């Protein structure tokens, strides 16, 4: 019986792979490893000893990195000779919600804010960076493969909509931060809604839109789960949904977000507002302990994909990472992408 069942499974996989080839779909049981390629304005120079040395445009920064468990290749003296500024953690380090708080120590003259660009073919946008009190600078460079995916799929759907006389595809970016993913969709002629619960962050995203010579992004300052539930009640659909939820957060009216408790509920609501055809979803997760396989299972369960023929959708999942100049790979987040 085991041999017969194995043969049936192998034949099933062969049939599935054949269907993927015919329908130009990627098989959904391969874990992908993706990293930014040929980005002139960003470089991970070295990593190790729980730190990373990065170049953003003309300026080099040292930041804490809990996943850099190995040794640095360059000496501490060499790091400090290269860096313009270094972030050191403060009293909140290790405390929930305050683990990234600390202070920047300037080593060379540099501005508090500066601009870098991202360009890959027709995908071209600018981002204003700044030194925040929580070690972040306004961009997560490892996300570049997600931006490429968002651009390519928004462009594909936009072209198909135009061919059929339909409106531009509606794209929803949840937990949207400073808007790199929103700009990727906008560059592909998406009708973009950008949602974040922090007013100052949305203002920052608007600046990035203007720096990129784009316009007409819809800005929403609201709790993400509340917004999605309302859209579901109204029957509104989107052809692209992007999610990069934090481990913890607060809505503008004090709503509490905890990833472990609310992610699956959020995904169930998102499943109701993603268009059933010619659509895509990108879920990205940074929280420690979350694997690519876990994110894939969450999406598969929320969208009831176990009940659907695999050739009717494409589900891919994997890790995003950065590679330093010494070929050390630094894994930073996991993702799942659904295309149908």
Mark where each language-model region is.
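Conserved class I S-adenosyl-L-methionine
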Residues: 168-174
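Conserved SAM-binding loop of SAM-dependent methyltransferases across substrates and taxa
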Residues: 178-190
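Conserved SAM-binding motif I beta-strand of class I
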Residues: 191-196
